Amino acid sequence: LADTHIRLLHDYLDSHECFPTVAIEGGVCYFRWDKDCIDKCKFISHSNGVVNVTERYLSENSSGIVIRDAGSLSILEKTKSEDNFSKLVSPRNLFKVEIEKLREQEKENGIKVFGRYNRGRGNQFLDNYITKDIRAERFLGKWKVFVSKADGAAGQLGNPIPARIIGKAELGDPFTICTETFLAVGPFNSRQETVNVMKYFTTKFFRFLVGVRKLK
């Protein structure tokens, strides 16, 4: 992304515009690299017959990805001054649950473990849970939101049908952790605060921000 020798880039969100008989998820792009030129890239986006041309650096707004939709850049620029929501999102496999120790019946003072079991979402149980991971400890005894680490659409969004941007969020009470299938968002001090975050997940603005990263 930091290469300023890429002088021209054509980006096709729908691969069929280049290869009518081939479906390539995420689309197709090609570019011209010029060793004698150090400047902005002429970025030409092709989408549903509409061509949009901008002059910009590929690393525009320091997001770590190429923002394919030029119209999104100004919106993203306005969010820079706000705290990044990703600070609330746990790393993968935060709790490092030992699956072989799970049981289907709940034991008094046990710990619920939210995950996917028998092709569906649900809870199983641990007799106890101890961790030395400071990141995991922060979530113990606190409210949190569970969201699938791999869900929703990827690549080309909204074509041919509106894409599911992110999977359904689940409320996690202070006595519940999750398997590696899910990420934990939080921690939060109250149920109401957690519910508010779940509502934020459903807003068009949040879906837009996540969608921009998926459309990379």
Predicted regions and their residues:
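Conserved small helical "lid"/interfacial subdomain of P-loop NTPases
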Residues: 4-5, 38
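Conserved S-adenosyl-L-methionine
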Residues: 5-17
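C-terminal substrate-recognition regions of SAM-dependent nucleic acid methyltransferases
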Residues: 15-216
